[in-house]
Amino acid sequence: MKVLSISLIFFALLLTGCSQVEKIAPDNFNKIFEEGKQFVENTQTEIEDIDIEQLIEKAKELGFNTEILTALYDELKRIHSIRKLSNCSNSMLLP
């Protein structure tokens, strides 16, 4: 689940960052897109548990929208909590 959550966050980070960059600097779009892609690949292999502060710091360095990232993180955390509760409830029903 953590890998899926991390992948979704980084994919959203990449998409939101790229959409912002396209408006600001269309000349360097491919370069920044590749840097974002590399960031996602590197970070995805390095992080096992998400530290939102480190993620926001790195996103700021790359010029991504941190408000969107924070909202996505909170939503994924909420969904993960609901699934944990659901799994716990289901296991309690089993004999």
Swiss-Prot record:
Q: What is this protein called?
A: Uncharacterized protein AF_2354
> Signal peptide position in this chain?
1-21
UniProt KW keywords:
Signal
Organism the protein comes from: Archaeoglobus fulgidus (strain ATCC 49558 / DSM 4304 / JCM 9628 / NBRC 100126 / VC-16)
